[in-house]
Amino acid sequence: MGQVFLLMPVLLASCFLSQGAAIENQRLFNIAVSRVQHLHLLAQKMFNDFDGTLLPDERRQLNKIFLLDFCISDSIVSPVDKHETQKSSVLKLLHISFRLIESWEYPSQTLIISNSLMVRNANQISEKLSDLKVGINLLITGSQDGVLSLDDNDSQHLPPYGNYYQNLGGEGNVRRNYELLACFKKDMHKVETYLTVAKCRKSLEANCTL
């Protein structure tokens, strides 16, 4: 009986520590989701502002090109639809989100074009991407319990973003900026979806459907 009483403080301390870790983990998820939501809204606004400066024919042509083209981040293997997203583990969604954010560290610096609003936004984006990357890395560390499990595709290096956009051809800055902004908006939407699902799973909510 004495041994049971001796173990009680240890068990209670362990319970409180576990509860504290869960609360901190949820706090980090809340911050990460909030930040990527802001980035997604910012990306949407920047794309809409740029799209609004195009002539109708120019807009249609660029949209057709973009639909046939691809974003460099498409090299990152990720869920193809909502069903696959919901089947993916929390750790997998976090790793994909980390890779997507990391893939924009360089190109976010090239979003600066001849518009004062976009210059300010671009500076904000670089800082927010860096903060979000650190936050996702903390979530990965807290979710993997010391075991790093990556698919073979996760170890592949993406080709340099700069080289890709330097080879777009004679259309110049208009197509380059259109694709940058469209891809950025697309990828921030992906990360927002993945982090929202991962956060829901960690909170043990009954319904995490998209």
From Swiss-Prot:
Zn(2+) binds at residues 38, 192. Disulfide bonds join 71-183, 200-208. It holds the Pfam family Hormone_1. Keywords: Disulfide bond, Hormone, Metal-binding, Secreted, Signal, Zinc. Residues 1-22 form the signal peptide. It comes from the Eukaryota. InterPro entries: 4_helix_cytokine-like_core, Somatotropin, Somatotropin/Prolactin, Somatotropin_CS. It is found in: Secreted. GO terms for cellular component: extracellular space. GO terms for biological process: animal organ development; calcium ion homeostasis; growth hormone receptor signaling pathway; hyperosmotic salinity response; magnesium ion homeostasis; positive regulation of growth; positive regulation of phagocytosis; positive regulation of receptor signaling pathway via JAK-STAT. Its main location: secreted. GO terms for molecular function: growth hormone activity; growth hormone receptor binding; metal ion binding. Growth hormone plays an important role in growth control and is involved in the regulation of several anabolic processes. Implicated as an osmoregulatory substance important for seawater adaptation. Belongs to the somatotropin/prolactin family. This is Somatotropin-1. It comes from Oncorhynchus nerka.
